[in-house]
Amino acid sequence: MDQSNRYANLNLKESDLIAGGRHVLCAYIMKPKAGFGNFVETAAHFAAESSTGTNVEVSTTDDFTRGVDALVYEVDEAKELMKIAYPIELFDRNVIDGRAMIASFLTLTIGNNQGMGDVEYAKMHDFYVPPAYLRLFDGPSTTIKDLWRVLGRPVVDGGFIVGTIIKPKLGLRPQPFADACYDFWLGGDFIKNDEPQGNQVFAPFKDTVRAVNDAMRRAQDATGQPKLFSFNITADDHYEMLARGEYILETFGENADHVAFLVDGYVAGPAAVTTARRAFPKQYLHYHRAGHGAVTSPQSKRGYTAFVLSKMARLQGASGIHVGTMGYGKMEGEASDRDSAFMITQDSAEGPYFKQEWLGMNPTTPIISGGMNALRMPGFFANLGHSNLIMTAGGGAFGHIDGGAAGARSLRQAEQCWKQGADPVAFAKDHREFARAFESFPNDADKLYPNWRNMLKLAAA
């Protein structure tokens, strides 16, 4: 059934929709399936299925219902682009406080429409939230400024937080795990659980928490510097998340502000993120996105992009989210990952299709991880344009030839190299840990700095 007369209005202007402030706007790349309707007809059916309609006209529809239809307002068939305006009245709100929820946003904008028989594929690439709806989201309660404050740094441009992920990701018992933390903390700032680490039979959660607390205290005594740890509290059960978080805070006592809470936000979903955000508003909320590539990968033509995921994370209240390495690490990514980092940190930012005004909502920190080491960092910082972020290098720290502490120092020296605008190989001559990174990661060194062996007078590794 052609529903374009009801669910498409190509005379609507985007500027008018934004000025009106009553619609969420979404941009999709969409292709109709062969043998079904044309582009506009398929887009209209998509809008119907995403809002007030179905595949037929139903007798219960009234004038009010038609007033909250989602409308296709722009198409470009050559670019496979369609834009849809969703009235904000369509979105579910909490009974307890009237707040908005990402679960409802996803259900409408990227729900049943992903399985429509007449759609070959459809992927959301950007969305716009009007002020009236944006104010209903929690947003972050803590930011990187809170971590800088704990570390004793300026709260403006406090700089690079040098972090790691204890490797191997599974298989360490509590004391060896804590020993690795201590080693890294002698040179670094921040350690996070890897996403599957929790309460394995060989590493009971409470034993690990106590061991890490002891390691943090010893490292702080040894260095005279504060340290940070991000604990995974992800669980299927809301009460399990609360129990984990409360035990951590009780154990760390006066160092509770040195602890972040990590949630696997993609696999556990918006409910888990909101549980952490609301139950523990004083803690830095670390959004890990494990599994997201199933829908966000450039190879996937359905779902939504990593940019969209990052934007949703800020609305939900993530203090920080992993945003990729912009093509500098081992994980799939592109230089355009920079757009995600920019969108979640600025108060006004241009996306691929929409400019978003955040109205003072706290920023979300870009967290960088996945195959990074000191040799890759100067180019990464140059691409991003600043170093106000958290970087968690697992192999990049513990793969250093002189161990985790030296690996941490090499990462910190990489930031210094970039800030000074120095040639990395020349800089290495006076910075031992950075120089030893060339020997630790010779394949990267050969690729990025072909003459390093002669310049540093080092033998082939």
From Swiss-Prot:
Keywords: Calvin cycle, Carbon dioxide fixation, Lyase, Magnesium, Metal-binding, Monooxygenase, Oxidoreductase, Photosynthesis. The keyword Protein transport does not apply. This is Ribulose bisphosphate carboxylase. Binds 1 Mg(2+) ion per subunit. The gene is cbbM. Coiled coil: none annotated. Its cofactor is Mg(2+). The keyword Lyase applies. It comes from Rhodopseudomonas palustris (strain BisB5). SUPFAM superfamilies: RuBisCo, C-terminal domain, RuBisCO, large subunit, small (N-terminal) domain. Homodimer. The modification N6-carboxylysine is found at K192.
